[in-house]
From Swiss-Prot:
Keywords: Ribonucleoprotein, Ribosomal protein. Coiled coil: none annotated. This is Large ribosomal subunit protein bL27. The gene is rpmA. PROSITE patterns: RIBOSOMAL_L27. It comes from Sinorhizobium medicae (strain WSM419). SUPFAM superfamilies: Ribosomal L27 protein-like.
């Protein structure tokens, strides 16, 4: 026979789903137009040349090229896409 009454269930045991934020394409990586470079909350990284900023602060490529992260004098990190040099015709 049981000498202890059954314990209640724990009040813990819940967690939210991860949001998969962060850098998706790193410096020097090749991207095409539309590729997501960074997913973020707020602007930890700021948009530079040839990138767009989505309403959820996602930074994405507007042109094909290589990703470039630059820290400027104001302390902000800017993400740009450097277009590839076109082949001479």
């Amino acid at each position: 026979m049981a000498h202890k009454k059954a314990g209640g269930s724990s009040r813990n045991g819940r967690d939210s789903e991860s949001k998969r934020l962060g850098v998706k394409k790193f410096g020097g990586e090749n991207v095409i137009a539309g590729n997501i470079i960074v997913r973020q909350r707020g602007t930890k990284w700021h948009p530079g040349a040839n990138v767009g900023l989505g309403k959820d602060h996602t930074i994405f490529a507007l042109t094909a090229g290589n990703v470039d992260f630059r820290k400027k004098a104001n302390g902000r990190v800017y993400v740009s896409v450097m277009p590839k040099a076109e082949a001479a015709e």
